[in-house]
Amino acid sequence: MKRFIIIIPLIFFLLVSCQQNIEPDHAEIPVDEVLTRALSTGKVGPDDPIVFLPATNMKAWTDIGPLEERFAASEVPASRLSSMTTEALVKSMMNYPLNYLVFAYNDPKMAIDIIVKHSPLHKEFLSRPDAAEVFVDMYAAAELDMSLEKSNFDGDYSSLSYANMMFMEYFWGTKVLTSQGKASIKQKLADSVARKLKNRLQDTVTFSHLSVDPLITIDEVEALGVSQSLSIDNRSGTEVTTIYTILEKPIDAFIYDEMSNREMEIITNDFVTQYPDAIVRGSATRKYNSHSYAWYESSLDNHFWIEYYDSDNNPQLSKFWTNDAYVECSGAETEVVYISDFDHSAVKLSNGNYLSKWHLGPLMEHAPSYSPYSSTNRRYFKFNFTSRTGGLTILGDTRVITNQTNLYSIDDTDKPYLTYDWEVLFMNAPAPTPFILSIGGLRGKLCYLTCQDYGLYKVKVYAYNRGYQIASGELDVISAPYW
């Protein structure tokens, strides 16, 4: 398996050191007041894009914790939207204050669907007959600015931030918008995708597969033939491996090529800017996601990405709490939270905060209602594991010659994830114990035993999965001078 060395830039440490402690619940501003601030920008014409709250008062924006209220604060009256040109609508989408959500969910399509569902702006745009043509014209003219200083809200529509450009590309790639078979639109889109894709493929220091994938997706859904012309035969460096719940249920885990340092910097910075009262506990990374951190390994060394569905599109996340080590509970006992509507998991800390990996974003400690995820439809779980015994068979002789070394082993060729510990008891006398024991083999699966006295010995073995005893076995061995 690939492991990655992440160089965390100075900017990351500066961001972390400047953050404040989290309050148990974030202060909320009345939505009506926020809307008034967001839209009171003076007289506007049909060609003028929306100026959203973050562009005029970032503090007021970040004081809004719940995601639902951020959507409410970004709403625009239908009368204003209907009077706007399609070009003005696209410009407004380019600087929409929730574009960062494309980095917050396992599947960017979920971010697009959620934004379209909650945003009258996007609904109005999709109702326009010239939507695809105007969108492609403006997308083709827009360049990507990967500088840390680039703002998501600066009103520069010819140079887009990373989050805004990724939103535009995923918006088309998820088939919310299509060329509808129009040759002129398709050709302009193909030319733009080819140019942008070539630039990103050439700059491997700045761009990883993460920045290439949405362009390849557009190419595939529109059948543009760009990837073929550039001889691209692999959309993403991905491995699929099998890991196991504590009680040995198989889980498909994905191992992704890591993001570039610049991509990690920008995504971390975006979430710190959007949620300054949350605390960064680990930088943005493609190594692991919220499910893997909450259910499998709560460590920065984790390098498995776990989806709700396995590689055959079968539900798998529920294996962690279905006849396994976790059980559903009331909120007071909670150790892990699952937010079903947003496919997100979080660890609940003793101070009441949540600790969760914001998918491509950083590992964040935050108040429960201060995140890119809804506060509704949450399920609560606690760890409820007790050590298991039995189930193991020890292979080896039961009659041995005194002072000869004998080998005992476990046949676990289909369980390479287990580790073992051995114990030997001399049953004829309590002490001293007359034997020599050494443990060897891969993961401790072999035991070398030399019985130094006559009598009955009890050989015991314990199997552990990630440190938890899930099985045991024992074997009676009789030692004698000869047989």
Where are these regions (language model features)?
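Solvent-exposed loop segments of extracellular immunoglobulin-like
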Residues: 413-421
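Bacterial Sec-dependent N-terminal signal peptides
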Residues: 15-43
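A short beta-strand segment in extracellular, disulfide-stabilized domains
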Residues: 401-412
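Edge beta-strands of extracellular beta-sandwich domains
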Residues: 469-479
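...with weaker cross-activation on analogous glycine-rich loops/strands in unrelated enzymes
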Residues: 303-365
